[in-house]
């Protein structure tokens, strides 16, 4: 590989790892298939200060999407919601959408109204894609969201990123030490292990998110989980995987 930087210097390497997030101009240059299809989803992220337990992660649904609430660095609360353009486009801006749609959920309204924004304005992410991606593209080993993104509703994206980095780094070390004979074998083994580790979780995540996007069905599913709480750890187990083993 030869990589040219903005300062016109050139770097050469036997290995390149792609860990540049869910969507980038690099994807366009690599002509990855998922980038050719428009996604109907957009995300909004806000950090606020207020009262929220350190050991709690909350998920609240609203018409057209869902919102996650969790404590992050600097004692801030992270509010991040995903919705579709169909639900969003009828409102003139984010504030109007939140007032008219999100705040129909009383719990979300209480969190937003009883906190103070820490960003000058909310961060928006358009074209969020949950489509299948290839773990290896043009001989580049892809990690994290670059290799595949799970719905925040039902998976730990940061955990997936760390796990895929572990898979990739261990195999790359074996390759550089001559334990894996060829580049083709390295790419094949990484693809095999990545799919074995994540494919089922991604499929379950897509299915759960699809069901919760159905406005008429989501309240019934939540009622079902309240009546049968033993189902929740089973769902978590299917979407979050196993603890990592450190060698």
Regions found by a protein language model. Name each.
Residues 1-111:
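Predominantly flavin-linked oxidoreductase catalytic cores and closely associated redox partners
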Residues 10, 89-171, 180:
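FAD/FMN-dependent oxidoreductases across multiple families
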Residues 34-38, 86-96, 158-160, 222-238:
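Short secondary-structure transition/capping segments
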Residues 35, 53, 64, 77, ...:
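Short capping/connector residues at structural and topological boundaries
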Residues 36, 40, 90-94, 164, ...:
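Short acidic-hydrophobic sequence patches enriched in Asp/Glu that either
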Residues 83, 106-118, 125, 206-222:
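FAD-dependent flavoprotein oxygenase/oxidase catalytic domain
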Residues 170-247:
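C-terminal helical "tail/cap" subdomain of flavin- and related membrane-associated enzymes
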């Amino acid at each position: 590989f030869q990589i040219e930087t903005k300062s016109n210097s050139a770097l050469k390497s036997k290995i390149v790892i792609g860990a540049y997030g869910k969507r980038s101009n690099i994807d366009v240059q690599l002509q990855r298939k998922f980038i050719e299809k428009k996604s109907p989803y957009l995300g909004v992220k806000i950090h606020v200060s207020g009262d929220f337990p350190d050991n709690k992660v909350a998920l609240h649904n609203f018409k057209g999407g869902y919102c996650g609430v969790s404590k992050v660095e600097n004692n801030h609360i992270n509010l991040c919601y995903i919705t579709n353009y169909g639900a969003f486009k009828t409102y003139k801006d984010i504030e109007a959408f939140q007032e008219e749609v999100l705040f129909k959920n009383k719990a979300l309204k209480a969190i937003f109204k009883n906190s103070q924004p820490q960003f000058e304005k909310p961060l928006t992410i358009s074209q969020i894609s949950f489509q299948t991606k290839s773990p290896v593209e043009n001989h580049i080993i892809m990690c994290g969201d670059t290799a595949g993104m799970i719905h925040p509703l039902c998976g730990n994206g940061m955990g997936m990123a760390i796990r895929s980095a572990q898979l990739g780094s261990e195999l790359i070390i074996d390759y550089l030490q001559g334990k894996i004979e060829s580049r083709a074998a390295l790419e094949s083994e990484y693809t095999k292990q990545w799919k074995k580790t994540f494919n089922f979780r991604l499929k379950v995540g897509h299915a759960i998110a699809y069901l919760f996007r159905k406005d008429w069905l989501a309240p019934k599913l939540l009622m079902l989980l309240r009546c049968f709480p033993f189902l929740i750890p089973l769902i978590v187990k299917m979407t979050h995987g196993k603890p990592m083993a450190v060698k």
